[in-house]
């Protein structure tokens, strides 16, 4: 992908993440951002997906009504790149070639993506809760225990979003006029 196109994709997808974060700001830990970052990594590679994740948190984490904390901003920015890297890694492993858009494969792919979304979110929540404990000077175990309800909500909602959203988003990206995926996904 050409550098101008890469920058455009990063800008547009980052804007989509930030916009959906603000749209869902009243719903704690329920966001489309992780799904968008993962699909961006899957569709455009780990570098693009990770850049979208980090930039989203740099914008959203700085201009956030919940306040600003540098250690937590660092952890969320770093943590969000995990989704982009995972999507890019699965792309390199050929997952795009195995992702079907036929009705018979949607359920199977949805379950796989839900499991991936749940696992990535568990890692993200662990990292960010550890950063919260550190930045607040609190013992780690009580912070992790107190975070369980929020983490479960985040993990389950992401599993649902990944189950329902990965294949349709990839399908939409495939339809873009100059999408690199058009060539890669012709056989799908």
Describe the function of each predicted region.
Residues 35-38, 57, 61, 80, ...:
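Hydrophobic transmembrane alpha-helices of multi-pass small-molecule transporters
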Residues 44, 48, 52, 56, ...:
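Short, flexible micro-motifs
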Residues 18-33, 55-91, 95-96:
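Interfacial aromatic-anchored transmembrane helix boundaries in multi-pass membrane proteins
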Residues 1-43, 47-51:
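Hydrophobic transmembrane alpha-helices
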């Amino acid at each position: 992908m050409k550098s101008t196109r890469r920058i455009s994709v990063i800008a547009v997808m980052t804007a989509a993440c930030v916009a959906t974060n603000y749209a869902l700001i009243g719903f704690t830990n329920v966001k489309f951002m992780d799904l968008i970052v993962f699909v961006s990594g899957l569709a455009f590679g780990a570098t693009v997906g990770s850049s979208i994740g980090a930039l989203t948190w740099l914008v959203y984490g700085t201009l956030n009504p919940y306040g600003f904390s540098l250690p937590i901003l660092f952890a969320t920015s770093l943590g969000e790149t995990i989704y982009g890297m995972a999507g890019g890694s699965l792309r390199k492993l050929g997952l795009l070639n195995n992702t079907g858009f036929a009705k018979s494969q949607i359920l199977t792919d949805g379950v796989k993506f839900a499991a991936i979304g749940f696992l990535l979110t568990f890692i993200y929540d662990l990292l960010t809760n550890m950063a919260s404990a550190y930045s607040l000077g609190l013992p780690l175990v009580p912070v992790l225990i107190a975070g369980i309800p929020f983490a479960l909500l985040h993990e389950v909602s992401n599993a649902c979003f990944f189950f329902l959203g990965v294949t349709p988003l990839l399908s939409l990206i495939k339809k873009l006029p100059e999408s690199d995926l058009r060539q890669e996904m012709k056989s799908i």
